[in-house]
Amino acid sequence: MTARKSLDRYRRIVIKIGSALLVDRKTGLKKAWLDGMCADIAALKAKGVDVLVVSSGAIALGRSVLDLPSGALKLEESQAAAAVGQISLARAWSESLSHDDIVAGQILLTLGDTEERRRYLNARATINQLLKIGAVPIINENDTVATSEIRYGDNDRLAARVATMTGADLLILLSDIDGLYTAPPHLDPDAKFLETIADITPEIEAMAGGAASELSRGGMRTKIDAGKIATGAGCAMIIASGKTDRPLNAIANGARSSWFAPSGTPVTARKTWIAGQLQPAGELHVDEGAVTALGAGKSLLPAGVRKVTGHFGRGDTIAVIGPSGREIARGLVGYDAEEARQITGRKSAEIEAILGYAGRAAMVHRDDLVMTASVKTKAEKLKKDEAHA
């Protein structure tokens, strides 16, 4: 497992900041806190670290300015609040960063900007150019146009996608939560804090709770989802509290935080994009033999598929689900949904007779597939069993 290191030893860091840290329901923007945050960013940049910020707060700022009532907002109310709040948020970041002669550049992304390959590459090029000229990209979801069906819905996963998109080696999620516990600490007094997470297992996923504040859409569940995206692409992740005046400085000085180790397996840029897709068009449920084959780096053949769900076309991203119900991989499927159902469980040699044309031997070719969960081969399982015998 890769060892944890000091913040200034990382090359590129993405910092996600929750709404509750930036905005007070009664008084609005927390200017003093933001100034401290920007001082931390300036200190990292002075040591040669690229810094990107995924900043929540537009809707929270907008509803404060518009004096909207507490409670859940309708979609159109959220979009109106975002339209007002985005102006205030961008201005606030620009002013605070200017104290250290740093230029801010605002980027508003939609889900399609990271899900569609061409737009993904264009967004990445824009962000990289901002970093090249020494600016700090301030990124948020474009809540003024995003719909409830086509959106990230939280900035934790958006931040993870930005981290993978830009090749960052550390993602920091700052909120009112100081890290991962074995159970929600406000509900379970015996909950234990986890300082280091080597791998996001089903047990780790089960520890996630829900959102605790109406100012924030994300909870521990979305942070774990973000961790799977980031660590799977070789990017470490830290979950820490941002309640202190200088949160990054606090982390550097040993403040409590949970560190998620990056995957030791490097992936290509294309596979990083595939793995980070937030909305797979469908699912291929596979048997244990297919799980073993995929873990050994082989393609997914129709014979190993047991069930097909969803509506998708050839080339769409699908999730591969193992017998336990856990996602183990994602890939670009070689057949549309109807064809995939017809050849499910059949040998590749039978494809032409079933479909009427000689298609690909693989349902998902290994070059178009990336593992999203660790899978042990039979030899590794046997070795582990022998060690415990």
Curated annotation (Swiss-Prot):
Its EC number is 2.7.2.11. It is found in: Cytoplasm. GO terms for molecular function: ATP binding; glutamate 5-kinase activity; RNA binding. It is an enzyme of class 2 (transferase). Keywords: Amino-acid biosynthesis, ATP-binding, Cytoplasm, Kinase, Nucleotide-binding, Proline biosynthesis, Transferase. ATP binds at K16, S175, D176. Pathway: Amino-acid biosynthesis; L-proline biosynthesis; L-glutamate 5-semialdehyde from L-glutamate: step 1/2. InterPro entries: AceGlu_kinase-like_sf, Asp/Glu/Uridylate_kinase, G5K_ProB, Glu/AcGlu_kinase, Glu_5kinase, Glu_5kinase/COase_Synthase, Glutamate_5-kinase_CS, PUA. It catalyses: L-glutamate + ATP = L-glutamyl 5-phosphate + ADP. It comes from the Bacteria. One of its GO terms (cellular component) is cytosol. Substrate binds at S56, D143, N155. The keyword Hydrolase does not apply. Transmembrane segments: none annotated. The keyword Oxidoreductase does not apply. Belongs to the glutamate 5-kinase family. Catalyzes the transfer of a phosphate group to glutamate to form L-glutamate 5-phosphate. This is Glutamate 5-kinase. It comes from Rhizobium rhizogenes (strain K84 / ATCC BAA-868). The lineage of its organism: Bacteria, Pseudomonadati, Pseudomonadota, Alphaproteobacteria, Hyphomicrobiales.
